[in-house]
A protein has these predicted regions:
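Sequence/structural segment immediately N-terminal to covalent heme-attachment motifs in c-type
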Residues: 61-84, 114
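Extracellular/periplasmic low-complexity linear segments
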Residues: 19-46
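Short cysteine/histidine-rich zinc-coordinating motifs and their immediately flanking basic loops
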Residues: 88-92
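Electrostatic cytochrome c docking/interface patches
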Residues: 39-70
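Bacterial N-terminal signal peptides
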Residues: 9-17
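Positively charged n-region of N-terminal signal peptides that target proteins for export
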Residues: 1-4
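Short amphipathic alpha-helical interaction/hinge segments
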Residues: 83-86, 126
Length: 151
């Protein structure tokens, strides 16, 4: 009886990712943008100017609060308040905005990758995310990254 029970649990856990979770399953929806970006990086790498970047700012309450404020005014419209990619501004985007909250917890994401993503936006991937390198100071981008690591 225990073997059958455990067999059903294992089978179910293997089957659920295939089914997805509604319209936003693992192979479509919010996670898809993260996978598209990851595939692009695996094929092309990222701009060498970003590869070795490391956040120079201290991870403290002041920088987290500043990053949160910047995120809320510049990112939350599309990525949602909690970073799930469910903001009203991103509902009709194809591909939809990335689920940052899940992505940042699933991977050991280097600072340079996050900086590149925010600075260059969707330009390398021809998506709707605007580049922020010309409208934000470096320190502002770093503060957003500090906040994202708290999601």
């Amino acid at each position: 009886m225990k073997k059958i029970f455990y067999g059903l649990i294992v089978s179910g856990s293997l089957f659920l990712p295939i089914c997805g979770f509604g319209q936003m399953g693992m192979m479509e929806g919010r996670m898809n943008m993260s996978m598209i970006r990851h595939h692009f990086v695996m094929q092309n790498g990222i701009d060498p100017n970003y590869v070795s970047k490391v956040n120079p700012l201290e991870r403290n309450a002041e920088n987290i609060a500043a990053g949160k404020k910047l995120y809320e005014t510049s990112c939350a419209l599309c990525h949602g308040i909690t970073g799930l990619g469910d903001g009203d501004g991103g509902k009709d985007l194809k591909p939809p905005p990335a689920n940052i909250a899940m992505f940042i917890k699933m991977h050991n994401v280097p600072d340079g990758y996050l900086y590149w993503t925010i600075a260059e936006g969707g330009i390398p991937l021809q998506t709707a995310m605007p580049p922020f390198k010309d409208v934000m100071q470096e320190s502002e981008i770093w503060k957003i990254i500090i906040f994202l690591r708290e999601l």
